[in-house]
A protein has these predicted regions:
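Low-complexity, Ser/Thr/Pro/Gly-rich disordered linker/stalk regions
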Residues: 1-62, 147
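Secretory/extracellular carbohydrate-interaction modules
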Residues: 42-114
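Beta-strand-rich interaction surfaces with strong enrichment in secreted/lumenal proteins
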Residues: 50-57, 125-131, 159-160, 170-171
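Short tryptophan-centered beta-strand motifs in secreted/extracellular beta-sheet-rich domains
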Residues: 64-66, 134-150
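Short, aromatic/His-centered strand-loop micro-motif at the edge of beta-sheets
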Residues: 115-138
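Short, solvent-exposed beta-strand-to-loop segments that form ligand-recognition rims
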Residues: 149-174
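Ligand-recognition surfaces built from glycine- and aromatic
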Residues: 165-189
Length: 189
């Protein structure tokens, strides 16, 4: 699967889905060669937390990549969600998920679980190195049994994730600033 985020080229593959952490349900704005999140005036950083996930679930041996850029403080991320359920307004929501999040100083990996009244947020990895805002960056994640193999530009690492489900929904999220997504590819063994 090779998807460019140009007008009319990506919508049939994805579904909007949202974390239970935030009540808003924003959409991406289409630009000529990419999709971008918008400023909302609600969040502290003033930008929407916007997610789209592929419609099918994937497991071990799947490799997903995206090309994205971000403005200062932006954090484009790969979303790995266990399950989806509908909220009272009919929007898809996810409660347990992992994030591989780029930012100006490298990337982080988070494991987030929805609890009864709050979220348990576990910081699994911080990999520090400079990433330039406004420049396109390539992110690839390969799902392995309870492991994630991660490449960001020319750097790589492998991470043990004991709570990684066998089958997951995969997609992208724009977080903590303005983010642009240009392309997404997916391969399976």
């Amino acid at each position: 699967m090779d998807i460019t985020f140009t007008k009319g080229n990506w919508e049939r593959y994805f579904q909007y889905a949202y974390t239970w952490r935030f009540p808003e349900t924003p959409k991406f704005r289409q630009e000529e060669d990419c999709i971008v999140n918008t400023r909302d005036g609600i969040r502290q950083n003033g930008c929407d937390f916007t997610s789209i996930l592929l419609k099918d679930r994937y497991g071990e041996g799947t490799r997903i990549s995206f090309s994205a850029s971000f403005e200062s403080y932006g954090a484009p991320l790969l979303m790995i969600a266990e399950d989806l359920e509908k909220d009272s307004d009919g929007n898809l929501r996810f409660g347990h998920y992992q994030e591989v999040a780029l930012w100006e100083n490298g990337f982080n990996v988070w494991d987030i679980h929805k609890g009864e009244s709050s979220f348990n947020i576990e910081w699994l990895l911080r990999n520090d190195f400079p990433l330039t805002p406004g420049q396109r960056h390539e992110v690839t994640v390969e799902l392995r049994k309870k492991r994630l193999k991660i490449w960001v530009d020319d750097r790589s690492c492998e991470l043990y994730v004991p709570s990684l489900p066998e089958k997951v929904y995969l997609g992208i999220t724009a977080c903590e600033g303005i983010n642009r997504f240009y392309r997404l590819t997916l391969e399976q063994e």
